[in-house]
């Protein structure tokens, strides 16, 4: 009996170890995907910048292009922040509804 419990406990530890390892690998894969996406965006940005720049441009012209691009990206960041806030609000509302359902279900079971 003790051997069965010991083996069962060892099986559980192995399962937990594998589960944590799987999650770690998932996080590393997601991190690598973000790095790939970020670097692809950088390449695209440089390609776009290269299309705008020609040999007759002055340094001031190039700086103006970069400033415009920066403003565009900052506006996008602001838009994403607003979108995240809206999503956060929706998640909070859903959590409250789920808690209300859970409370109602437990009260129903008590009766």
From Swiss-Prot:
One of its GO terms (cellular component) is cytosol. Residues 92-111 are annotated as: Disordered. It is found in: Cytoplasm. Pfam families: DUF496. It comes from the Bacteria. Pole-localizer protein involved in the regulation of several cellular processes. This is Pole-localizer protein TmaR. It comes from Actinobacillus pleuropneumoniae serotype 7 (strain AP76). The lineage of its organism: Bacteria, Pseudomonadati, Pseudomonadota, Gammaproteobacteria, Pasteurellales.
